[in-house]
Amino acid sequence: MRSASSLYAAIDLGSNSFHMLVVREVAGSIQTIARIKRKVRLAAGLDADNNLSAEAMDRGWQCLRLFSEQLQDIPPEQIRVVATATLRIAANAGSFLAQAQKLLGCPVNVISGEEEARLIYQGVSHTTGGSDKRLVVDIGGGSTELVTGRGSQPTTLYSLSMGCVTWLERYFSDRQLGKVNFEQAEQAARAMIRPIADSLKAQGWQVCVGASGTVQALQEIMMAQGMDERITLNKLQQLKQRAIECGKLEELEIEGLTLERALVFPSGLSILIAIFSELNISSMTLAGGALREGLLYGMLPLPVDRDIRSRTLHDVQRRFSVDPEQAERVRQLADSFARQVSLQWKLDDRSRELLGSACLLHEIGLSVDFRQAPQHAAYLVRYLDLPGFTPAQKKLLATLLQNQVGNIDLPLLSQQNALLPRIAERLSRLLRLAIIFASRRRDDRLPAVRLQADDDNLTVTLPSGWLEAHPLRAELLEQEARWQGYVHWPLIIA
């Protein structure tokens, strides 16, 4: 029999950090109630005989005392606690776990590397958008998981005994950021990956996602520096060079890198460079969730959507009372426009999908107030939890919604980093036109619109007599041509 409580908790006793995630089940989806994370650096407390030091164990117990208070009102059957790499190998893990279970009041399961990889993939499949066929990479403090899969099913599961804490202690223990340190760390990581590389490459993948603190740190760095969100080997090598220039770990300064993440960033970076090199990864983006989300979704009777983004968009529409028929009407129009100019404007499937998402959410600001509805919409999208969308994609959607009507904020379109600024500008133009043409909110009042693009010049051709028969929309289009002209986007209505 299911508990009446809608609260669930997942706790991950990792080698670098302990994490707790508490959620509430709401209408078939989850709402985050609390996230607590503490750096305990458990792996750093292992001696040559794999015994945890008293200090490391005490750091862990102090953290669990914090967690235990939050767990008191959650049924034990709705709590899952797992321990990973360090507690798999610690000779005195039993002593630590006995006290941990007393503090938490529930069992702590030490899971195998393969089970950890499976749970990570489960978390990614529930929270991350993109292609059905993926490679998932998670660099933890004491282990690194590599998983391929299709949809919700993993196809290969690997857990390697290398992590950002163990590599820190092994290859950066002198606190120097020299070429030799990085070379040794990378070569050791490549030697770990090489035996499984062929198996992973044989499965293949269409997208690669990273689900670790190292990848999160890279995303924060790239957003701070105005780079696009895709992680590439070239960007990783540039960041390595910047770290080497800093000379010492204590003097590591990279724009966007927080002090909290700095200590294990070089070791995590060296492992990631090795993974990119051995597996020939072209690019990677940040996953929406991993181990903790995998634990939670394992307890919740929720289906894995084939497209997590579709579920998210549907949930947001329902929550903010969006007219789904009008949203779909605008989406279909915008998609038609995008397909007509896709070759000239270099709009790929990814760009068109993000444009469609903006269309489906463009009216959420009306739930706050008609006045400044675009600003309200942008604010909501910026701060809502949108599973399936990366932080950079959320920023792009917010930017498009803020620019959906009226004055155009060009700097805002340049500040997002999900797409090239020129592509974002072109999506904005198409969204604005689709909203105008769909303003009657009826399918039988949509004209046959033909678009032609020549660089930034956009010509909109309408059936003969249409403008005369529709004076309001003719006026809106005339004003739109002026708005776009102010930012040097030539728009011709014919």
From Swiss-Prot:
Record keywords, A-Z: Hydrolase
Coiled-coil ranges from the UniProt annotation: none
GO terms of biological process kind: guanosine pentaphosphate catabolic process; guanosine tetraphosphate biosynthetic process; nucleobase-containing small molecule interconversion
Gene3D superfamilies registered for this protein in UniProt: 3.30.420.40, Exopolyphosphatase. Domain 2, Hypothetical protein af1432
GO molecular function annotation: exopolyphosphatase activity; guanosine-5'-triphosphate,3'-diphosphate diphosphatase activity
Record carries keyword Ligase: no
Ranges annotated as spanning the membrane: none
Pfam families per record: Ppx-GppA, Ppx-GppA_III
Domain of life: Bacteria
Pathway: Purine metabolism; ppGpp biosynthesis; ppGpp from GTP: step 2/2
Reaction(s) catalysed (UniProt annotation): guanosine 3'-diphosphate 5'-triphosphate + H2O = guanosine 3',5'-bis(diphosphate) + phosphate + H(+)
Group of enzyme by EC: hydrolase
Entry-linked InterPro entries: ATPase_NBD (IPR043129), Exopolyphosphatase (IPR022371), GppA/Ppx_hydrolase (IPR050273), Guo-5TP_3DP_PyrP (IPR023709), Ppx_GppA_C (IPR048950), Ppx_GppA_N (IPR003695), PyroPPase_GppA_Ppx (IPR030673)
Record's keyword annotation contains Transport: no
EC number: 3.6.1.40
Family the UniProt entry places it in: Belongs to the GppA/Ppx family. GppA subfamily.
Biological role: Catalyzes the conversion of pppGpp to ppGpp. Guanosine pentaphosphate (pppGpp) is a cytoplasmic signaling molecule which together with ppGpp controls the 'stringent response', an adaptive process that allows bacteria to respond to amino acid starvation, resulting in the coordinated regulation of numerous cellular activities.
Annotated NCBIfam families: exo_poly_only (TIGR03706), PRK11031.1 (NF008260)
Protein name, UniProt field: Guanosine-5'-triphosphate,3'-diphosphate pyrophosphatase
Organism annotation: Erwinia tasmaniensis (strain DSM 17950 / CFBP 7177 / CIP 109463 / NCPPB 4357 / Et1/99)
